[in-house]
Design a protein with these regions (language model features):
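Short loop/turn segments immediately following beta-strands, especially the blade-tip
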Residues: 173-177, 219-222, 308-317, 362-368, ...
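Short C-terminal beta-strands that terminate individual repeats in beta-propeller domains
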Residues: 7-10, 60-67, 116-122, 180-187, ...
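Conserved strand-to-loop turn within each blade of WD40 beta-propeller repeats
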Residues: 42-45, 100-103, 162-165, 207-210, ...
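A short helix->beta-strand "capping" segment at the edge of beta-propeller domains
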Residues: 1-15, 55, 320-324, 416-426, ...
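Short coil/turn segments that connect the beta-strands within blades of beta-propeller domains
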Residues: 36-37, 94-95, 156-157, 201-202, ...
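Canonical WD40 repeat/beta-propeller blade segments in eukaryotic WD-repeat proteins
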Residues: 13-31, 69-89, 125-151, 189-198, ...
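C-terminal scaffolding/assembly regions of large eukaryotic complex subunits
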Residues: 2-8, 25-27, 31, 543-546, ...
Length: 955
């Protein structure tokens, strides 16, 4: 594979200004998070990213695009009260997302359509901070029963917005609306409100820029108390800036100010309990645990500091706070935190100007590693035209197109440049680009925002030696241009463009190519609406809330190589396919099949454009819903070497659709039949390489490499690249275990021949201890081995019953918590052991059947293990080998067997990988000597210009 490592794409990751989980932390909740748990990340360009923690996988589902001169400075989620159902049950309330951004408005977002839903503004200053009222919880009466809410009591969540003029605005979210309720303003000078939080449902705590903290009663708007922090440090400003205020579960107020101090205030008399010098610069934000025994602070000195509550000595009932550890997880300011906890997970997510979210273990701090998520978009904002050697990228409101030359011997780069910017498009308006696509021949460019769609004709200027492009705007029908799109794509033949509306409605438009060089392509005025198959709706519990139709959001759309089949995948795991047929040859649907009436009527109503009609490809047996959201879809291209063997006319090509889920389950379907392919039946998820199943970063895209001897699928994420040869099956777990045992036996016999027979292997107590520790993490990184731990927290305790110390029993503190007998099974992780065993058994039977039918002898060979390296000449260096089974051939002794998989972590901060090369040049070449040519676009953070930061040295 020929690789062009490209770092010329000036994509600029935006700073993280706000973080918010959709659910509050709760130490009483079982499991690893509710199904509707999401993390919203607000960035400096107005984008809001929606992440699904996915039990530690961290999957970026969608991005709510911002616009010109917009910024997200605060985020808050609310949950509407549950509604009564038809059968007396309670229907879950809707989860709602709100944001602020250096304006006088609070914006509510429609996450189903990815656009603002409503705004609330008034006659007050710029909003600097935002907080949501705690959720209403029922209390128990004297008899132990839960009491209903009082008559007229609001059980929803109000919003509190702190303004630059010193006022605090209370907004009501009742009746699925956002209305002004009241304004609270101190009677003294007008000072900025920098931070707000709730001590309880009725008491609001606000931090000001005048060295004070004020408490209000939101029911009456009355000022309850003013807490003074005193003067600032010597040599600095007189007044302290209270950048952050938080409240512990017992009501204790925690504040962080511009002096770098953390202060604890009594919940009742508001007296100062303790102050700690946590930072050498401003303390920008604070996070507290659900139990109130851990506090985390971040500051402008790039440090993250953890504080723990320590019980007093004997006779002293007062508990004291002490600093446990501080580290630099960020390369710039630590500006914001978000916390989520259950019984099994405990994490804090931090962000700042360095644009990368960092996931920290909160309860297991010091026992688990942190994890840094990517600052780059998880949906590649790249496309290429292989025949024209063009690479397109977009960000904000700009589209750039580069041309990559072949190499030093190319006549196109006489000046020595390997790449050249040949075209740029600036989109008018305020909205950022949601999606853009360049056709395979490089002649059509489609650009979409949330409000409009634009098409451009791309041609090479005549007589221009530098290859500059001439980009002309095409006339787009009003029906296509209006309402915008969240995803757009172009068919490989350039005759169809598919758009996914903000509400995930799918449409197709026909493009008529230009007949002469002077003409422009023409877009047909009539659109084809594609109806997706009806799926069963998942109902959540009332306490979980609902995201509406958000799970049905279409994330990816792809055409087959012959442009006759279209597939889409959404966040719920549903895959839909459509086929292009001649109107006269289209088969008629029979209504004897259950549920086929609607599909038949929809297909018959589809318009006929130039004698062709789109219909459901798998209408009789739709593709079943996958277990998790679809990350990417890709049709396996037809192998040109194998197609040449068919001489009786054009062969009917198979449309095999490869799907990868957010849990990294690799599945291949027959898109027309709606069934699993033979390869997918023989290779379930349990057969995938163990290291690939353990990759934390989710996949972003894929590239195919096909020839007579190989059918390789290259998958990539932000920090990894994997290759799978689909001509071969993955080894089963039994084969891997047998190979590992044989390898250990060989090593043992070799070592025994060198050592004396009287020598015995010493047992390592650290290895035994590590094997006994629990494997699951708490939501961040992997567990830190005891030998590498810096804190050395106790891993065991001695349990003594009675007065006899000799009967004491040592118990491990790291064992997995047993499941409560009355706990909800849905709150715990899904146990896939039974399903995996069935998949393995079925795959084994299918492989035995294939072996009997083909009668191909198998032999055992070695492949490179985890330490393999790819050398410059394409050779493989294998210091440690594993065993695998591959078919034997007549000349197998002279040829090295092909690898089943290969991976590398050499490339970091990948923005995307796109194919290059000319099909015309490759047509006459030998298929065996054909090599895949790709452009690997990297965007490391050290190439990004960041604002100035605090550089003072500290211990």
């Amino acid at each position: 594979m020929d690789i062009h490592r490209c770092r010329f794409v000036p994509y600029n990751p935006q700073a993280i200004n706000a973080l918010a989980f959709s659910h509050p932390p709760s130490a009483e909740l079982a499991g690893r998070g509710v199904p509707t748990l999401r993390l919203a990340i607000g960035r400096a360009n107005g984008d809001i990213e929606i992440w699904n923690p996915l039990r530690g996988a961290w999957f970026q589902e969608t991005v709510l695009r911002g616009g010109k001169d917009r910024s997200i400075e605060g985020l808050a989620w609310t949950l509407d009260p549950p509604e009564p159902g038809p059968d007396g049950s309670k229907l879950p309330g809707r989860l709602r997302l709100f944001s602020i951004g250096y304006s006088t408005a609070v914006t509510e977002w429609d996450i189903e359509q990815g656009r603002p839903l409503r705004h609330s503004s008034g006659n007050y200053g710029e909003i600097w901070c935002l907080a949501a009222q705690p959720r209403w919880q029922a209390t128990r009466g004297k008899d132990g029963k839960l009491l209903p809410p009082a008559e007229g009591e609001f059980t929803g969540q109000h919003l509190a917005a702190g303004c630059a003029d010193g006022s605090i605005v209370i907004l009501s979210t009742a009746d699925n609306d956002l209305k002004y309720l009241r304004t609270m303003r101190p009677s003294t000078k007008r000072s900025r409100v920098l931070s707000v939080t709730f001590q309880n449902r009725n008491t609001l705590v606000a931090g000001y820029a005048d060295s004070s903290i004020r408490l209000y009663d939101i029911r009456s708007g009355q000022l309850l108390r003013t807490i003074s922090l005193g003067k600032g440090p010597a040599g600095g400003t007189k007044e302290l800036l209270v950048w952050s205020v938080k409240c512990l579960p017992d009501g204790t107020i925690v504040s962080g100010d511009s002096a770098g101090e953390i202060r604890f205030w009594d919940a009742k008399n508001y007296a100062l309990i303790q102050r700690l010098q946590g930072h050498l610069a401003d303390t920008l934000d604070i996070a507290v645990s659900a139990k109130g025994d851990t506090v985390v602070s971040g500051g402008a000195d790039q440090r993250t500091v953890v504080y723990r509550k320590k019980d007093g000595e004997k006779g002293d009932k007062k508990a004291r706070w002490t600093e446990v550890m501080h580290r630099r997880y960020h390369t710039h300011d630590v500006k914001t935190f978000a916390v989520y906890e259950t019984r099994d997970i405990s994490i804090a997510v931090s962000g700042g100007p360095d644009a990368a979210p960092v996931v920290l273990p909160l309860r297991e701090f010091g026992k688990e590693h942190h994890r840094k998520l990517s600052s780059l978009p998880q949906i590649p904002q790249l496309a290429s035209s292989p025949s024209s050697r063009l690479v397109m990228s977009f960000w904000d409101r700009e589209v750039s197109i580069w041309r990559l030359h072949r190499g030093p011997a190319s006549h196109e780069n006489a000046d020595g440049q390997r790449h050249r910017l040949v075209g740029k498009v600036l989109i008018q308006g305020e909205e950022n680009i949601t999606s853009a696509m360049l056709s395979a021949d490089g002649k059509i460019l489609v650009v979409a925002t949330i409000s409009t769609i634009k098409l451009f004709s791309v041609r090479r200027r005549k007589g221009d030696e530098k290859g500059t492009l001439r980009i002309q705007k095409l006339d787009v029908p009003k029906a296509l241009a209006e309402d915008g799109a969240r995803v757009v794509t172009v068919a490989p033949n350039g005759q169809w463009v598919c758009v996914v509306r903000p509400n995930s409605a799918m449409y197709l438009a026909r493009i008529r190519p230009a007949s002469t060089a002077q003409e422009k392509p023409h877009i047909h005025s009539q659109l084809v609406k594609l109806n997706r198959a009806t799926r069963h709706t998942r109902f959540e519990k009332a306490s979980h809330g609902t995201l509406g139709e958000y799970e049905r959001t279409v994330r990816c759309v792809v055409f087959s190589d012959d442009s006759k089949v279209l597939a889409s995948g959404d966040l719920s795991g549903c895959v839909d396919t459509w086929a292009l047929q001649n109107a006269e040859d289209a088969p008629k649907k029979h209504n004897n099949a259950a549920g086929s009436d609607d599909d038949s009527s929809d297909d018959e109503d589809q318009p006929v454009i130039e004698g062709e009609r789109w219909s459901h490809a798998a209408g009789e047996s739709p593709i079943p819903r996958l277990k998790s959201g679809v990350v990417l879809l890709s049709f396996r291209p037809p192998n040109p070497a194998k197609t040449k063997l068919l001489t009786n006319g054009a062969a009917k090509g198979e449309h095999r659709l490869m799907a990868l889920t957010s849990e990294h389950q690799l599945v291949e379907f027959d898109a027309v039949e709606g069934k699993l392919s033979d390869w997918s039946r023989r290779n379930p998820k349990a057969f995938l390489p163990e290291e690939f199943r353990g990759v934390k970063d989710r996949a972003m895209g894929c590239v195919w490499d096909l020839s007579a001897a190989r059918e390789r699928l290259w998958l990539y994420g932000t920090s990894w690249l994997w290759m799978f040869d689909l001509n071969q099956d993955f080894p089963s777990p039994e084969e891997l275990n047998a190979s590992a045992d044989n390898h250990e036996d060989e090593n043992a016999s070799t070592q025994a021949s060198k050592k004396s027979s009287t020598q015995k292997r010493k047992r390592n107590p650290f290895e035994e201890e590590e094997n006994a520790r629990k494997k699951p993490n708490s939501g961040a990184g992997d567990r830190i081995p005891l030998a590498q731990s810096d804190l050395f927290f106790a891993a065991k305790m001695r349990k003594i019953v009675g007065s006899d110390e000799g009967q004491g029993e040592w118990m491990s503190l790291d064992k997995e918590r047993p499941r409560a007998p009355d706990a909800d099974d849905e709150a715990y992780d899904y146990d896939e052991a039974y399903t995996a065993n069935n998949d393995v058994a079925l795959a084994r039977l299918r492989r035995e059947r294939q072996f009997i039918e083909t009668s191909t002898p198998l032999k055992r060979v070695s492949i490179g293990g985890k330490q393999d390296k790819l050398l410059l000449g394409g050779d493989i260096e294998s210091p440690s080998a594993q065993k695998q089974l591959v078919p034997a051939s007549a000349d197998s002794k002279s040829q090295q067997p092909s690898r089943r998989w290969w991976h590398t972590y050499k490339y970091r901060d990948l923005l995307g990988i796109v194919p290059l090369g000319s099909d015309a040049d490759d047509a006459d070449s030998d298929s065996d000597s054909h090599f895949l040519e790709v452009a690997v676009v990297e965007r490391p953070m050290w190439d990004v210009d960041l604002p100035g930061r605090y550089v003072r040295d500290y211990a």
